[in-house]
A protein has these predicted regions:
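Structural recognition of the conserved hydrophobic beta-strand(s) that form the central parallel beta-sheet
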Residues: 66-67, 144-150
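Inter-Walker segment of RecA-like/P-loop motor cores
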Residues: 84-113
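Walker A/P-loop
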Residues: 18-37, 149
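SF2 helicase catalytic motif II
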Residues: 114-147
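Conserved Walker A/P-loop ATP-binding site and its immediately adjacent core
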Residues: 31-38, 46-83
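Conserved nucleotide-binding/hydrolysis micro-motifs of P-loop NTPases
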Residues: 71-74, 107-109, 151-152
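Conserved pre-motif I regulatory segment
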Residues: 1-23
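Conserved Walker B
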Residues: 26, 123-125, 151-152
Length: 152
């Protein structure tokens, strides 16, 4: 079974680029859309997004870091969204040999020296000039990244 995105999600994936902001309402499927973009950036097959059989990405895909709210990290919302992509933070369940980390904005400084990975920044917190912004700027220079936001 494939991933099965809605048409508007496929349209969004096709418009996305490194460094973009994906804006959508609460419950609009931004997380799954972001994972679909990651899937395609790592040699995933577009037909899998339309509901065709899942075709694995090249192995290993880039390490994936998801920086989100502490609540979303603790409730494992992202874990559920990763299931159709056969991704998991648990190496025994993850189909691939890449590293996947889901952490909160409070810990973003731990990742400022990561390079050649893919970051999804959920719930935009990169305005201003504080430590989160400084860490984000360092991460953005050495990695692929996208931002998800429910606020315009």
């Amino acid at each position: 079974m494939g991933i099965g995105l809605y048409d508007y999600q496929i349209d969004a994936v096709n418009r996305m680029r490194n460094g973009c902001i994906l804006n959508g309402g609460v419950g609009s499927g931004k997380s799954r859309t972001a994972l679909a973009y990651y899937y395609l950036r790592n040699d995933g097959d577009p037909s899998s997004l339309c509901g065709d059989d899942y075709i694995p990405m090249g192995d290993p895909p880039k390490d994936l870091y998801i920086i989100t709210t502490a609540r979303k990290r603790d409730t494992k919302e992202w874990e559920a969204d990763m299931v159709p992509f056969l991704l998991s933070t648990n190496p025994e369940i993850n189909l691939y040999s890449n590293k996947i980390m889901i952490d909160s904005w409070n810990n973003i400084t731990k990742y400022k020296d990561i390079t050649d990975a893919f970051f999804i920044f959920d719930e935009d917190r990169v305005t201003g000039s504080g430590v989160w912004v400084k860490s984000f700027l360092k991460i953005a220079k050495s990695n692929e990244w996208i931002i998800l936001s429910a606020t315009p």
